[in-house]
Amino acid sequence: MGANSSSISELPDNEYLKKLSGAEPISENDPFWNQLLSFSFTTPTNSADLKLLEEATVSVCKSLVEKNPRTGNLGSLIKVFLSRTKELKISAECQNHLFIWQAHNALFIICCLLKVFISRMSEEELQLHFTYEDKTPGSYGTECEDLIEELLCCLIQLIVEIPLLDITYSISLEAVTTLIVFLSCQLFHKEILRESLIHKYLMRGRCLPYTSRLVKTLLYNFIRQERSPPPGSHVFQQQTDGGGLLYGIASGVATGLWTVFTLGGVGSKATPQLDQCSPLANQSLLLLLVLANLTDAPDTPNPYRQAIMSFKNTQDSSAFSSSHPHVFQINFNSLYTALCEQQKSDQATLLLYMLLHQNGNVRTYVLARTDIENLVLPILEILYHVEERNSHHVYMALIILLILTEDDGFNRSIHEVILKNITWYAERVLTEISLGSLLILVVIRTIQYNMTRTRDKYLHTNCLAALANMSAQFRSLHQYAAQRIISLFSLLSKKHNKVLEQATQSLRGSLDSNDSPLPDYAQDLNVIEEVIRMMLEIINSCLTNSLHHNPNLVYALLYKRDLFEQFRTHPSFQDIMQNIDLVISFFSSRLEHAGAELSVERVLEIIKQGAVALPKDRLRKFPELKFKYVEEEQPEEFFIPYVWSLVYNAAVALYWNPRDIQLFTMDSG
């Protein structure tokens, strides 16, 4: 590096990097370090520059891998960085730009080297490079482990203790990035790592006491969304003489958004590059998700997950429980606001899911909010644009709704919140609709999309479970929401008839031919009948619990009464059809007595009058529909690849060669 580097492409020939990776040991006190660390640059963020930087770093690393066991220069560089960080807090308070600048540059080089080392060697090999012992070969173990632990601990201290100012923003970001890089060994393993060396250091020993402070700081970084300092307030001034590391590189390198690779199993579309004006917030959230999803050690639960599960509101004055060792307090109002504002990203939705599912304090607070629409509307928008989202993002949004609908208070309150002009809902102009009716519309639309495209049973199940949880509390359903409920049933009915016909034809064909195996129409029929049963239970639940609140649903039911005829005598639906049949018969009779040519308004009036007169004791009682979200066994098999796919796609200034990734599959098509 040094003051004379002018472009990434020149890095392999840079005299300072050649010396660092050369055959000559460099002591920690050598003036060389001041020369190496005196460079000015803007960290690259586009794909072309990042790929160039990676390739240049690989070239330097090859030499360093070969020579470092004899020179110990990597260890010396790390010790130089460690010695400089001891005075960082004072430097920040005293506005010592030069000191912070050089400390940042040291960490940037360490991070670049580490990223290549970790992608190309085992943890055992990595350990060997963290020490140099000239006297007694084989005695490296303790010292190298201590140096790794010391660096990890130093990075955590830097994140939690250094005040976030314009001059410290970049080094704080680099510290978060380096911790992500330390944990990135998972990317290069197909199986989930359960006993990683780095995990061990982060979960016990010197790092452990910082657990709650680290989680709290990362959360506050996400909450505050601090923007990257503007050029000019930054410690790294761009040199006007062309001496800056990346000066003039745009003329020789094609720039543009990072080409994001589609992840098999993570989505069918590439995730768009997100607005990276708050890189520290983005990177902090990604690190938090990685830490929270580390697997438990055999004898120790993941302390970062414990901290996520147990933190409390700053307004909560109750004593900390001794059963939660990593409790801290955070401003829930600020957290709620940030969660509402950031739901366009997968990682913010995943954080919301984790907090609602794992932290009872957060869940209770969210459900008590009187502005719940600020949280629910962004989630509904994710589901509405299902074709633009990867499947994991849709699942997380859906499970969040399912968790919320487990609460009766939520199911009541959403029908009291009236919304005006939902501009993103394109199928129909909705000038005024309750949040509850909009939620029903979006969930039904998701089911219909799934029926025609992905045919994912898991998605169906969660959509229907959310509707079922809400059904007893349906209130004043919008006429369009009521129509869509019955339209969905109509679609299911047609699908049932089609599958039934295919099954019948298949059975006839099997009697005439013994050749190829036939499609399993019986299983298809079973699945569609399960979904129909669930829809009938949802309609029945609304009719038995809140018929008088929902004239529009009764109207839609009567308008399409012929749909239900075929299911009256079906053995799978006879019991649940009794109430629906009774309601249809009761109101049909009243409408017939009222005469022909009735207006919509008159029909609704008759329905409202009839709802009061309908003898409730004639409606058969069924168990209340209640579904609870339960995380599957070994959730890490889902969440760890998902989290790392988010890191791969959304991390700022981090590039990994897609050919090296083992944890998830790449699909460029």
From Swiss-Prot:
It holds the Pfam family Dymeclin. It comes from the Eukaryota. Myristoylated in vitro; myristoylation is not essential for protein targeting to Golgi compartment. It is found in: Cytoplasm; Golgi apparatus. Keywords: Cytoplasm, Golgi apparatus, Lipoprotein, Myristate. GO terms for cellular component: Golgi apparatus. One of its GO terms (biological process) is Golgi organization. A lipid is attached at residue 2 (N-myristoyl glycine). Necessary for correct organization of Golgi apparatus. Belongs to the dymeclin family. This is Dymeclin. It comes from Gallus gallus. The gene is DYM.
